[in-house]
């Protein structure tokens, strides 16, 4: 059987923006395998069916190189075991080192750590989305561990070319400043603190976006004030228009070793972004972000008013954002070269 020429990129998930981006860069085929996703009680059946579909895919595609996303750890584990039979090079995209995110469940954490180390040592290469995770992989004995950061190119349409009505299909409360916050639904994303900060601020409108199945129950419990809007998940066109009209963004989270994808989006649009003080974020974005020490409403409110009402602060942020973008663009180009070397050469 003839082998496919391009790499095969696989995730046991409904979608992965990283895999789509990488697939486009290297001319690979991206496959998302999704059965009973999010149904914890059905996990054993789910993983068994996914394993069978993955083996069937390998037999059909006969790839020379496979990029597999972790988590779920069972996908790269299966591929490590299948490698000798199907004769492909395996690169694992570690979206996170999950054993460190499950430390509150020590037995689960230890079990995952054993599997992570086994996979990382036997894969031909290992990539992660930030340097902290890359160091953790190397500490586990990972082969050829490297970092591939998220990167969002600057848009070609400027803020002034878009009207706010294009993203909002309903009348908006009167406001002077539009604040946005996109969330994926992780429990350590600080939605409640963001809403509390806006609750007492006149003239500010906060728009929180994200899937209703992930955020809806939390938003309902908060009974948000009239200057907080939750439209759910916006399609690409409406979300892009929202970003073009935003004055400030909030990205408050205490999730371990995580760089929210939304920060890359905000900074690509030149939106001043407020984050909780974090060495990892500072190492990547430096002066392009606004760091705060805590998430008390008065602290967040002071940062918002300083950005929106002090032109000197805004101008300096604008310069910092552009300089940081140029630095990250150079780094991105270098990382793309490494990625192509690993997946195509």
Where is each model-derived feature located?
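Conserved acidic donor-binding segment of nucleotide-sugar-dependent glycosyltransferases
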Residues: 288-298, 306-311
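Nucleotide-sugar-dependent
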Residues: 186-189, 237, 241, 249-268, ...
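Nucleotide-sugar donor phosphate/pyrophosphate-binding loop at the beta->alpha transition
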Residues: 45-49, 89, 98-118, 187-188
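Conserved donor-binding/catalytic core segment of Leloir-type glycosyltransferases
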Residues: 161-163, 171-189, 195-201
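A charged, aromatic-enriched C-terminal amphipathic alpha-helix characteristic of glycosyltransferases
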Residues: 309-343
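Donor nucleotide-sugar binding/catalytic pocket of nucleotide-sugar-dependent glycosyltransferases
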Residues: 17, 21, 34, 113-160
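Nucleotide-activated donor-binding/catalytic signature segment of Leloir-type glycosyltransferases, i.e.
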Residues: 216-241
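Membrane-proximal helix-turn-helix segments that form the acceptor-binding/catalytic region
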Residues: 55, 81-85, 92, 107-126
